[in-house]
Curated annotation (Swiss-Prot):
Keywords of this entry: Disulfide bond, Pheromone, Pheromone-binding, Secreted, Signal
Pfam families: Lipocalin
GO terms for MF: mating pheromone activity; pheromone binding; small molecule binding
Organism taxonomic ancestry: Eukaryota, Metazoa, Chordata, Craniata, Vertebrata
Family classification: Belongs to the calycin superfamily. Lipocalin family.
CDD domains per UniProt: lipocalin_MUP-like
Free-text function comment from the UniProt entry: Male pheromone which stimulates female sexual attraction to male urinary scent and promotes a strong learned attraction to the airborne urinary odor of an individual male. Promotes spatial learning by rapidly conditioning preference for its remembered location among females and competitor males so that animals prefer to spend time in the site even when scent is absent. In addition to promoting a rapid attraction response, also elicits ultrasonic vocalizations and urinary scent marking in females which do not occur immediately after exposure.
Gene Ontology, cellular component aspect: extracellular region
Tissues expressing the protein: Detected in urine of males but absent from female urine (at protein level).
Stated name of the protein: Major urinary protein 20
GO biological process entries: olfactory learning; positive regulation of neural precursor cell proliferation; positive regulation of neurogenesis; vocalization behavior
Gene: Mup20
C-alpha cells in the first residue's frame, strides 16, 4: 500500500512538473510571462560557422519585451572585438506561436519549451539567398543554467537533426555582459 501511495505521489509530481512547461504553439502558452531580462546560454545549428566567433548568429539576448502582436528584442553582438547593440521586432505570423523577423535573412521562430522562470528554448529557421539553416537557442533568466536543462536543450537540438558538435555552451564566452544596462 505504501508503495502504491508513493507511486501515486511520484506520478502527480511528474504531471505537475510537466504542466509547468509550455510551448508557444500550445493554447496554454502565456506570452506575457516571457517578458523581461534573459541571457544567451547555448546555441545550436546545422551551419556551425553561423554561431562560431564572428558568426552572424552569435548574438546575446538582453531582454524580450512583449508587445501587442510582436516581441521587441535587444541583443548584443561582438563586432571588431567590441560589443554592439541590436534591436529587433519580431512580428506574429498567421501560424499559431510563430514569429518572423528580418536579420541576416528572413527568420521564423517558435518557442519550443519554457518554464517562464528559468529558461526558454527557441527553434529558428533562417532563409537567405536561397539557402536555409536552423538555429536553436537556449536563454536563461540567470547567466547560467543547470546541467539538466542544458542536456534537455542538447537532446531537443538532436531531435531537430543538429549534431552535438554543433551545440555551443556560451557561459564561459564573452557574452557582452558588461554592456548590459
Amino acid at each position: 500500500m505504501k508503495l502504491l501511495v508513493l507511486l501515486l505521489c511520484l506520478g502527480l509530481t511528474l504531471v505537475c512538473v510537466h504542466a509547468e512547461e509550455a510551448s508557444s504553439m500550445e493554447r496554454n502558452f502565456n506570452v506575457e510571462k516571457i517578458n523581461g531580462e534573459w541571457y544567451t546560454i547555448m546555441l545550436a545549428t546545422d551551419k556551425r560557422e553561423k554561431i562560431e566567433e564572428h558568426g552572424s548568429m552569435r548574438v546575446f539576448v538582453e531582454y524580450i519585451h512583449v508587445l501587442e502582436n510582436s516581441l521587441a528584442l535587444k541583443f548584443h553582438i561582438i563586432i571588431n572585438e567590441e560589443c554592439s547593440e541590436i534591436f529587433l521586432v519580431a512580428d506574429k505570423t498567421e501560424k499559431a506561436g510563430e514569429y518572423s523577423v528580418t536579420y541576416d535573412g528572413s527568420n521564423t521562430f517558435t518557442i519550443l519549451k519554457t518554464d517562464y522562470d528559468n529558461y526558454i528554448m527557441i527553434h529558428l529557421i533562417n532563409k537567405k539567398d536561397g539557402e536555409t539553416f536552423q538555429l536553436m537557442e537556449l536563454y536563461g533568466r540567470e547567466p547560467d543554467l543547470s546541467s539538466d536543462i542544458k542536456e534537455k536543450f542538447a537532446q531537443l537540438s538532436e531531435e531537430h537533426g543538429i549534431v552535438r558538435e554543433n551545440i555551443i555552451d556560451l557561459t564561459n564566452a564573452n557574452r557582452c555582459l558588461e554592456a548590459r544596462e
